[in-house]
A protein has these predicted regions:
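Ferredoxin-reductase
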Residues: 2-85
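FNR/FR-type flavoprotein reductase catalytic core
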Residues: 77-216
Length: 259
């Protein structure tokens, strides 16, 4: 589907936890949206120049609705948190490649769906899209959980918290070790230290892993080269081994990127 910019409508919005907001948007972009893709949301304040890329959390194609769950991290997302039902907003999408769910062909395959922090929301649509043995392993800072009940509809949820207030004390890798879990495939989204640990684990255990890289983006369409990552492959034309996260990703096979 070609990316396009359109006016959409806020269907609902609620605060899930301090600084974490849950918004449903009515838009035709839902027609072909995939797990792991993102949209760009445009602030209305003229002083806030750039759109904000936000991962797609959930899709309801029959209602032409997209769900985004985001953290207020600056002026743009702070503005988004004030939007009310019925308000019009400008969005562009759908952007990025998404998770390769077609890699899972057997319902007996055990798959780790791993999310950390604001990397948890895209795991929801991914869990909905897969028909297999799903272990949903998510990491939070503390007991301020979000999307737990939503995720539990689609697989076994294992929780890790940094302070040990819920589930395993530590991170998602600590939860795997504590539970003695094994997988045939890994999909993950979260902060870079978490993704590095997953990449190392997957390579050591010889498990295929696909990771969604979080990165600040400016244009969202590959023009500005502000969100590149190093890859093993060298481009035949430029002779550099960089990929644009916004267009070549944000999902990459873990063994193909240097992080």
């Amino acid at each position: 589907m070609a990316k396009k910019k359109e006016m959409a409508k806020v269907l609902s919005q609620q605060c899930l936890q301090t600084g974490i907001y849950d918004m449903w948007i009515g838009t035709s972009l839902a027609d072909e949206a995939k797990a792991g893709q993102f949209i760009c949301v445009y602030p209305k304040n003229a002083s806030t120049l750039l759109p904000r890329p936000i991962s797609i959390c959930e899709v309801l194609e029959d209602r032409q609705a997209l769900r985004i769950v985001y953290r207020v991290a600056g002026q743009g997302t702070a503005e988004f948190s004030t939007y009310q039902e019925g308000e019009s907003i400008a969005v562009m999408g759908t952007l990025g490649n998404g998770f390769p769910v077609e890699k899972v062909t057997d319902e007996k395959t055990t798959v780790f769906l791993m999310g950390g922090g604001i990397g948890i929301p895209p795991i929801l649509q991914l869990a909905k899209s897969l028909n297999c043995d799903k272990k949903i392993i998510v990491g939070y800072r503390d007991a301020s959980l979000f999307l737990k009940e939503d995720l539990e509809k689609y697989g076994e949820v294992i929780i890790a918290t940094e302070d040990g207030s819920v589930g395993t004390k530590g991170n998602v890798m600590d939860a795997i070790r504590e539970k003695g879990l094994k997988a045939d495939m890994i999909y993950a989204c979260g902060p870079m230290p978490m993704l590095r640990a997953i990449k190392q684990y997957a390579e050591k255990e010889d498990i295929p892993a696909y990771i969604s890289l979080e990165e600040r983006m400016a244009c969202g369409v590959g023009a500005c080269l502000g969100c590149v990552c190093k890859t093993k492959d060298v481009d035949a034309h430029s002779h550099v081994h960089n990929a644009r996260i916004c267009t070549d990703g944000p999902v990459f096979e873990a063994k193909e990127v240097e992080i």
